[in-house]
Amino acid sequence: KAFTLIELLVVVAIIGILAAVGVVAYNGYTASAKESVCKNNFSLLKKMIVQNYTFCEFQDSINIKTQYLNNTPGKDRMLSCPQNFGTIAGETTKSFGNNASSPYEPNLAYNIPILSYIGDPPTDGGIAYYPESAGFKLRMRCRGKVIVYQWPISQFP
């Protein structure tokens, strides 16, 4: 007793449908995971900025790394204190590629796209920062949406 051609075609069709559903679900899971990592990177960067500013209030200088470039970690350097919040926030943001990488493009030569300009980051996982007259503005693009955080001058830590 053997299977008929129709029975085999039905089994193949069912396997195809299950595979298609699995691929769609997997893509959704990975997109959600990348977005979560991106948002965690943003949160970590905000904490690092406040931490470095606080350290600079109590020390003559703080150790900060230069920007991660060409697959090479930044070098340690001393940033003299006191500095204004915008300078510390900018230097901390530039050095952030030493601590995190883009979940959307994990093999970048600079780990994470970091731009010092007033607009939104052009790619997912990218960071844009700019010291403005109203304060320091930080932006990060995660899954097509830009997250914005601004420290108003009146509320600098």
Predicted regions and their residues:
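Alpha-helix exit/C-cap motif
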Residues: 43, 47-79
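N-terminal single-pass transmembrane signal-anchor helix
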Residues: 1-27
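Surface-exposed intrinsically disordered loops and tails
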Residues: 66-128
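Aliphatic-rich helix starts adjacent to a transmembrane/signal segment
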Residues: 25-44
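Short, surface-exposed interaction loops/tails
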Residues: 116-157
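Secreted/processed peptides and extracellular or luminal domains of membrane proteins
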Residues: 44, 62, 86-88, 148
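Short, low-complexity cationic-aromatic patches
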Residues: 17-25, 69, 125-131
